[in-house]
Amino acid sequence: MKVFKFIGLMILLTSAFSAGSGQSPMTVLCSIDWFMVTVHPFMLNNDVCVHFHELHLGLGCPPNHVQPHAYQFTYRVTECGIRAKAVSQDMVIYSTEIHYSSKGTPSKFVIPVSCAAPQKSPWLTKPCSMRVASKSRATAQKDEKCYEVFSLSQSSQRPNCDCPPCVFSEEEHTQVPCHQAGAQEAQPLQPSHFLDISEDWSLHTDDMIGSM
């Protein structure tokens, strides 16, 4: 009960911060398999532009999708030293840090980032035009926008594309082609769960419950 009260308090504080700043400098999204952090170049203040090469996630993971208005880190929850804590049978909290080291000044910052995800949730990414390679799956017409879905069963597969992971055929292990995200306008992602918690969590095997 205390855990859920704490989560509710942090959501309230996060909402208040976003409303006060006018634009959220950082967004954290996650699923049971993936962790995504989107950072605004003016994350510190309006006078300091942070360059993407001055940032890394966790244990040295650089942003893997850079745009003029945002830097995005998208990694598996088993990478970059991301920590996990099962707070219930249905909910896991993932946490790590964004490290900033200025190239022109001695300034350094460590910003904790966390996100809560249900243990059986799929990850829905932004629409991405694709052709489905497997006949056993629903097919999409050329240039039709489809939502990519991936979950824990595909965690052993690593697609090679710019956008977050494409759909794989589990029967044929065939990768669905995915257009690079840079060819599309950035569209806001709709998180099913959003949370930013500064408390440090550590991963213990015994904590991972049930379907983990």
Swiss-Prot record:
Location within or outside the cell: Secreted
Superkingdom to which the source organism belongs: Eukaryota
Broad class of the protein's primary localization: secreted
Signal peptide: 1-22
Gene Ontology CC annotation, any one: extracellular region
Disulphide bridges, residue numbers: none
Entry's induction text: Up-regulated during trophoblast differentiation and by FGF7 in trophoblast cells.
Keyword hit for Protease: no
Keyword annotations from UniProtKB, A to Z: Developmental protein, Secreted, Signal
Tissue: Expressed in placenta. Localizes primarily to differentiated syncytiotrophoblast throughout gestation as well as to a small population of villous cytotrophoblasts. Also detected in maternal blood and rapidly disappears following delivery, but is not detected in other adult or fetal tissues examined.
BP GO terms, sorted: placenta development
Function: May play a role in placental development.
Entry's family note: Belongs to the PLAC1 family.
Entry protein name: Placenta-specific protein 1
